[in-house]
UniProtKB/Swiss-Prot annotation:
Family: Belongs to the UPF0102 family.
InterPro entries: Restrct_endonuc-II-like, tRNA_endonuc-like_dom_sf, UPF0102_YraN-like
Protein name according to UniProt: UPF0102 protein RALTA_A3032
GO terms, molecular function: nucleic acid binding
Tree of life domain: Bacteria
Pfam family membership, one: UPF0102
Bias type Polar residues, positions: 1-12
Length: 131
């Protein structure tokens, strides 16, 4: 009979993703942003973190983690299709609000030895998501 010991296994993809989001969230809070929603999902889209900047701007954050810089690293892994899914989810989220605040799309790119916060990483118009 084969046995499996979780203590020697690597964390699941979902667990690694949650750890990356925790790390990104902690960094953004240190920069003065406050969490609004985590893992917002709708049909066809998802947002890892929705934060509020000190000036009231709503910040939609995509968190990307890579084990190395191959293929351009974490930031390069955000394809136009992924941007469209984030924008779609952001539009869905904004439709639930009584008043739409200023918004932006940021990326937190995590690699083993660094964290990079890319503010205004992309915009809704350039992402090409339909209304």
């Amino acid at each position: 009979m084969m046995r499996s010991f979780k203590s020697t296994q690597e964390p699941s993809r979902q667990a690694r993703g949650a750890q990356a989001e925790d790390r990104a969230l902690a960094h953004l809070r240190r920069q003065g942003l406050e969490p609004v929603v985590r893992n917002y999902r709708c049909k066809g889209g998802e947002i890892d973190l929705v934060m509020r900047a000190p000036d009231g701007t709503l910040v939609f954050v995509e968190v990307r983690q890579r084990s190395g810089r191959g293929f351009g690293g974490a930031a390069a892994s955000i394809t136009p299709a992924k941007q469209r899914r984030v924008v779609l989810a952001a539009r869905h989220y904004l439709a639930t609000l009584a008043r739409v605040p200023p918004c932006r799309f940021d990326v937190v790119a995590l690699e083993p030895d660094r964290l990079e916060w890319l503010q205004h990483a992309f915009d809704a118009d350039a992402a090409g998501a339909g209304s």
